[in-house]
Amino acid sequence: MRRLLAAVLTLLPCAVHAETVTFGLDWKAEAEYGGYYQAVATGIYAKHGLDVTVKQGGPQVNHTQLLLAGRLDYNISSNSFLALNFVKENIPFRTVASMFQKDPSVLIAHAGQGNDTFAALKGKPIMISSDTRVGWWNFLKARFGYTDAQIRPYTFNLAPFLSDKTAIQQGFLGSEPFSIKETAHEEPVVMLVADAGFTGYASLIATSDKRIRENPDQVKRFIEASIEGWYSYLNGDPAPGNALIKKENPEMTDALMAYGRESLKKHGILDSGDAAKDGIGAMAAARWAAFYASVRDQGIYPAGLDATKAYTLQFVNQKAGMGK
């Protein structure tokens, strides 16, 4: 009885003093957010004194606006462009970790059409979203000579792609390729934009400068717990996180989540590059500087922008969670 009482008392401080945190995703619950759901389901956030609510996003949800309005404490920024936008627009928020070392964005084509390299797609119609047009599309224009005349609207619906063997569209590594295989029973050509040399980070965690300044301990605990959740999800049993994902997003199947998780692992989306030595979430000032220089030269951002204001290295590169 005494031993049980001692164990309960040991847990009480975390339960009583847990800080409430609201965290927004940039899309619906799926394996690409598995680490966060794993951290909730397995008590990793609770162990760090945090009571975290994960709010999924979607096509009609602008969590960046909710973050700026103070209705979210932390938010997933899809890519490095959003972080630089904060600087350009003088908005006092910044990136505190980059969970994805590689952007999982892909271009997808049908096999047997000669559309199996980025270079081969020059001059051909490609379905992309408005966000992509102002994002990594500019990298492809500079790298491979693509033009805006190639752009066709992408509505996040696979029907146009499936009905046209010459069609090419954007997608995400762990999602659309699987759906195409399941629906059309064909193996599509999948080209990862990061493999073509795109150096932008992806799935970045953003918060306010005010929070960083006034509550750095919470930021540190949130980032460390999120990183631990990712190591647990990738290297351990993902079932707890997957169960929460399915509860949040009933469209998710076990097969799709397994495919998404395996895609993250196979391509080193989280743990390659600097993350291999410094841990998941790693960022490097040199990489940020190089990315800014490239998008500045493409005319996306003005010269003289202080890219160091887009991020802080205060909470990463500390090998948190490695070996767990």
Can you say where each PLM-predicted feature lies in the sequence?
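Sec/Tat-exported extracytoplasmic proteins
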Residues: V40-G43, H48-G49, R71, I76-N79, ...
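Periplasmic-binding protein-like
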Residues: M99-I108, H185-I212, I223, R261, ...
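Ligand-binding "clamshell"
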Residues: E19, N85-V96, D148, S163-T166, ...
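Conserved C-terminal helix/tail region of periplasmic/extracytoplasmic solute-binding proteins
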Residues: A285-K324
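Secondary-structure end/capping motifs
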Residues: R213-Q298
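Short, glycine-/small- and polar/acidic-enriched structural segments
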Residues: T20-Y154, L158-S163, A167-G174, T199
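N-terminal signal peptide c-region/cleavage motif recognized by signal peptidases
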Residues: P13-A15
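Positively charged n-region of N-terminal signal peptides that target proteins for export
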Residues: M1-L4
